[in-house]
Swiss-Prot record:
InterPro entries: Ribosomal_bS18, Ribosomal_bS18_CS, Ribosomal_bS18_sf
Subunit (UniProt): Part of the 30S ribosomal subunit. Forms a tight heterodimer with protein bS6.
Record's function text: Binds as a heterodimer with protein bS6 to the central domain of the 16S rRNA, where it helps stabilize the platform of the 30S subunit.
Record-given protein name: Small ribosomal subunit protein bS18
Protein family according to the UniProt entry: Belongs to the bacterial ribosomal protein bS18 family.
A GO biological process held by the record: translation
PANTHER family hit by this protein: 30S RIBOSOMAL PROTEIN S18, SMALL RIBOSOMAL SUBUNIT PROTEIN BS18M
Domain of life: Bacteria
Organism name: Wolbachia sp. subsp. Brugia malayi (strain TRS)
Keywords: Ribonucleoprotein, Ribosomal protein, RNA-binding, rRNA-binding
GO cellular component terms attached to this protein's record: cytosolic small ribosomal subunit
Pfam short name (any one): Ribosomal_S18
Keyword match DNA repair: no
Amino acid sequence: MTKKRNNFNDSYVSVNNRTGFKRSKVCPLATSQDEDIDYKNTDLLSRFTSDYGRILPRRLTGVCAKKQRKLRLAIIRARFLALVPYCTKKV
């Protein structure tokens, strides 16, 4: 995010608000070979759903696009077979 700061001679200078280095995200499912994305693995699927039962987006979980599609399909299958609830908290 850039912010414009007024200089003494009324010209604007672009200043970057971010400090430090941006951490590179590594897919948590690609590093662990033990955990396979399967609709029967409810412990794994529950880590990628919110408290209300919604599927968390990639920007929050850090999962790559390929694994996110597999996760989505596995969660939908598990919901259909009643292994994972559609919603967990009462709204």
